[in-house]
């Protein structure tokens, strides 16, 4: 039998050539005399005699419209022969029966949908009313390709899909976490253990998302034999939300923060309806706030707003930049930098956006009603209603305003934004507040704000003067009113605030410059100033490529006093990594360090080693060492750091972040996924160990994994890493796309085959063989091969022990059981028994 294998392969090659020829002709009649077949009458050529012919029946196919998949997974599509009309009517090819639900996924305009009619008892779409639509099935590849003129489709671009293509995902549960632990020992004998955590738990059902944010910590210290322990845990908020694509808005119920572009943010319990710029094409969207600073050691950075933790992570020593905050965050943020020696520095960042401009004819709005909430879940104050809106009056002008109505507290704001063209964009507004406090007088005051933004294209620079704000002594925000009424706290009444951001690139010098400055004055306490300035340059010298020099300075608060820091870093490529020198100054102390940093494992692992001298400040010099390591595994993002200061302290810290996602389609542990955000559950057909998303995600033993770097409402592309696939695994559908609504658990299925490649001889119960050209499919409906001369079939992706189906004349005729001990390099004689 082995001697006949080359001949069998030639027969299969002949069939492939015939099928290719059929694609170029409308109809073909075959001369079977050229084939060396034992029974030339037992040949099923129906699938080759017409171009695009598909045997009637059901197929599992991926529907591709203009190169883009329309569904999370392959769809079960029936091929139906159209009914004959008249005695002499020509028999038509079986047609793909696309249901109305499938058609709605294609992104057709409303006018185009009206032109689609249905046949076969209203089950199958007919696109003859849309000229230019071309449907081409390829059952071997498991694909149904549809080419459609763009005129029939809604607007889309390379990064955005229309709302009709947005996916609310599948039902499921999630748990996201972020853990940080530090153990430190003081030279004088004291030691401390600190552990903090925060995250989100939630569940999805249809378009609705239920979320609960949590945070907690435990601190234990021992000094002079005395042990103290502090523990705390809180559910910081509970809320329910969903997207309303038709209104380009989000509906939120429960505990939330008012993220206003006009009024100061405050917490509340109630309901809100807010337009969401993320539902617009990317070029029309807003921005996300960025936070920069300097860490003197491997430090923990905590970003919070009104006590709720938004970001908590470890950063290595030196300048840091946090850019992955949610774009919906508005208002003043509190930033705390916790050094390894326990020292804490604080500063604030105002996330005021660029001038409030809206495209002509569009309206952006926010409507909120409820009761104000303190740091816990208790509500306080009267029921309030607030709203704000911006209307694009023309290409140059936008009008905006808002109001807060709460009985004893009311505020009204009005303003305008002006696109000056070449000079930039400008906006100005005024807010009037009236606050009546029981038993005291009424406070009335105004607050003026001026904002400016300009992009200098020729100079490759941005400047944002996002505020000058002046507030009268008796002006009150809602938060200040609540503090005065319920806590008799009239302190920290703002007077003037300046915020300036400047970014400048000098391409000829490979130099970048960044400045962030904020100044806040008060009526009753001393002013505060915060700034961060940095200059970075890259150049080549003495044959070394990519030498970098960076200089930065910043101001923060330490023990209620201003703390100025400066940092210098010089880095030189060395081997696969980077050698560096850094010098820093803070509180009259100077630190000089030499170090080495490297990444490996395709960027999934990195480490840094540093050693140096700490001197100045009237204290003796101290040697200092620290090391930092991070690893991104498929299950979690992990990092560890260690530091030691001579006659000072020794500390060790670890952190981990990740989550668990559980759905009816599968479950997996995963890295990333903070705050219950959008994610994509990928399914590799039950095949484990498949690398996805550049190897950052590897499917588990059940063939599922979770991709968390998914942007809501964007067109996201996720692919199998073909270079890292195991030898016995083949991906026939290796790229999927998704456009998920906020908080969705998306689901996409890759077509992955794992198994052997076999030569099999198929025999029917009477000793005959299936006809030449019969199709062999797996239990999942995937075509694995076709029958050639004498029942010989070359099959790929066969799993030992599975049952295969053999199809001809438009239906399953018999089934084949593959032995558990199938061997690839042998021919197998397999009986094909009638379907049960």
Swiss-Prot record:
Pfam families on file: PapC_C, PapC_N, Usher
UniProt GO MF annotations:
fimbrial usher porin activity; identical protein binding
Primary gene name: papC
**Stretch forming the signal peptide:** 1-24
InterPro entries listed in its UniProt record: Fimb_usher, Fimbrial_membr_usher_CS, FimD_plug_dom, PapC-like_C, PapC-like_C_sf, PapC_N, PapC_N_sf
Question: Per the annotation, which location comes first and is thus the protein's main one?
Answer: membrane
Entry protein name: Outer membrane usher protein PapC
Q: Which UniProt keywords apply?
A: Cell outer membrane, Disulfide bond, Fimbrium biogenesis, Membrane, Signal, Transmembrane, Transmembrane beta strand, Transport
Indicate where this protein resides in the cell: Cell outer membrane
- Is Lyase set as a keyword in this record? no
Q: Which family does it belong to?
A: Belongs to the fimbrial export usher family.
Presence of the UniProt keyword Membrane in the record? yes
Membrane-protein topology: Multi-pass membrane protein
**Stored PANTHER family:** OUTER MEMBRANE USHER PROTEIN, OUTER MEMBRANE USHER PROTEIN YFCU-RELATED
- What Gene3D superfamilies does the annotation carry? 2.60.40.2070, 2.60.40.3110, 3.10.20.410, Outer membrane usher protein FimD, plug domain
Disulfide-bond pairs as recorded: 814-832
One Gene Ontology term from the biological process aspect of the record: pilus assembly
Its function?
A: Involved in the export and assembly of pili subunits across the outer membrane. Forms a hexameric ring-shaped pore in the outer bacterial membrane. The 2 nanometer-diameter pore allows the passage of the thin tip fibrillum. As for the rod, it probably unwinds into linear fibers which would therefore be narrow enough to pass through the pore.
Give the GO cellular component terms, alphabetically.
cell outer membrane
């Amino acid at each position: 039998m082995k001697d006949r294998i080359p001949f069998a392969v030639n027969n299969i090659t002949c069939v492939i050539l015939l099928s290719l020829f059929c694609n170029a002709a409308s109809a073909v009649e075959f001369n079977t005399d050229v084939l060396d077949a034992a029974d030339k009458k037992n040949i099923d050529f129906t699938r080759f005699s017409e171009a695009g012919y598909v045997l009637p029946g059901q197929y599992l196919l991926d529907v591709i419209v203009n190169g883009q998949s329309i569904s999370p997974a392959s769809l079960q599509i029936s091929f139906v022969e159209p009914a004959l009309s008249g005695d002499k009517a020509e028999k038509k090819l079986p047609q793909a029966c696309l249901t109305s639900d499938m058609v709605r996924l294609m992104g057709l305009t409303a006018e185009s949908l009206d032109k689609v009619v249905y046949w076969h008892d209203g089950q199958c779409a007919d696109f003859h009313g849309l000229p230019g639509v071309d449907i081409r099935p390829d059952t071997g590849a498991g694909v149904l390709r549809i080419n459609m003129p763009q005129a029939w489709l809604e607007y889309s671009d390379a990064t955005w899909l229309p709302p009709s293509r947005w996916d609310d995902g599948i039902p499921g549960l999630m748990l996201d976490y972020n853990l940080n632990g530090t153990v430190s020992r003081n030279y004088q004998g004291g030691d401390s253990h600190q552990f903090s955590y925060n995250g989100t738990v939630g569940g999805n059902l249809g378009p609705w998302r239920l979320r609960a944010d949590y945070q907690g910590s435990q601190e234990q210290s021992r000094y002079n034999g005395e042990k103290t322990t502090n523990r705390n845990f809180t559910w910081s908020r509970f809320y329910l939300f969903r997207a309303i694509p038709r209104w380009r808005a989000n509906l939120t119920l429960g505990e939330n923060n008012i993220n206003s572009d006009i009024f100061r943010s405050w917490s509340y319990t109630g309901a809100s309806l807010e337009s969401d710029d993320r539902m617009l094409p990317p070029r029309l969207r807003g921005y996300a706030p960025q936070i920069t600073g300097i860490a003197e050691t491997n430090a923990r950075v905590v970003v919070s707003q009104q006590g709720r933790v938004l970001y908590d992570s470890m950063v290595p020593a030196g300048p840091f930049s946090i850019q992955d905050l949610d774009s919906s965050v508005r208002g003043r943020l509190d930033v705390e930098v916790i050094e390894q020696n326990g020292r804490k520095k604080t500063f604030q960042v105002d996330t005021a956006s660029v001038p409030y401009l809206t495209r002509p004819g569009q309206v952006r709005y926010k409507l909120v009603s409820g009761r104000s909430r303190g740091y816990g879940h208790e509500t306080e104050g009267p029921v309030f209603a607030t709203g704000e809106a911006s209307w694009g009056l023309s290409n140059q002008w936008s009008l905006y305003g808002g109001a807060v109505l709460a009985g004893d507290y009311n505020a009204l704001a009005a303003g305008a934004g002006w696109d000056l063209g070449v000079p930039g964009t400008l906006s100005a507004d005024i807010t009037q507040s009236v606050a009546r406090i029981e038993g005291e007088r009424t406070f009335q005051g105004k607050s003026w704000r001026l904002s400016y933004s300009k992009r200098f294209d020729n100079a490759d620079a941005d400047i944002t003067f996002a505020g000058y704000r002046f507030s009268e002594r008796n002006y009150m925000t809602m938060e200040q009113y609540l503090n005065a009424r319920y806590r008799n706290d009239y302190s920290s009444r703002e007077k003037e605030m300046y915020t300036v951001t400047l970014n400048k690139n000098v391409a000829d010098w490979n130099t970048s410059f960044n400045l962030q400055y904020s100044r806040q004055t008060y009526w009753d306490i001393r002013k505060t100033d915060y700034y961060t300035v940095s200059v970075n340059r890259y150049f080549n010298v003495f044959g070394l490529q990519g030498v970098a020099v960076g200089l930065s300075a910043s101001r923060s608060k330490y023990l209620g006093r201003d703390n100025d820091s400066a940092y210098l870093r010089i880095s030189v490529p060395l081997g696969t990594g980077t050698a560096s020198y850094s010098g820093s100054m803070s509180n009259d102390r100077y630190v000089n360090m030499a170090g080495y940093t490297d990444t490996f494992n395709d960027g999934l692992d990195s480490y840094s080693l540093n050693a140096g001298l700490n001197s100045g400040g009237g204290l003796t010099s101290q040697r200092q060492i620290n090391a930092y390591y991070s690893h991104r595994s498929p299950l979690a993002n992990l990092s560890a750091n260690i530091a030691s200061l001579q006659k000072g302290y020794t500390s060790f810290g670890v952190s981990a972040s990740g989550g668990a996602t559980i759905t009816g389609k599968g479950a997996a542990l995963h890295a990333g996924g903070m705050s219950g955000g959008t994610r994509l559950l990928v399914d590799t057909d039950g095949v484990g160990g498949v690398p996805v998303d550049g190897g950052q995600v590897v499917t588990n033993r059940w063939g599922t994994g979770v991709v968390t770097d998914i942007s809501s409402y964007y067109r996201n592309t996720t692919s199998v890493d073909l270079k890292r696939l195991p030898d016995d695994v083949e991906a026939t559908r290796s790229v999927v796309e998704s456009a998920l609504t906020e908080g969705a658990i998306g689901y996409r299925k890759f077509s992955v085959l794992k198994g052997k490649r076999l030569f099999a001889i198929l025999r029917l119960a009477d000793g005959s063989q299936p006809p030449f050209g019969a199709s062999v499919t797996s239990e999942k409906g995937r075509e694995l091969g076709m029958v050639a001369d004498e029942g010989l079939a070359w099959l790929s992706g066969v799993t030992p022990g599975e049952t295969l189906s053999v199809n001809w004349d438009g239906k399953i005729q018999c089934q084949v059981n593959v032995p558990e001990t199938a061997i690839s390099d042998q021919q197998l004689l397999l009986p094909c028994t009638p379907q049960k």
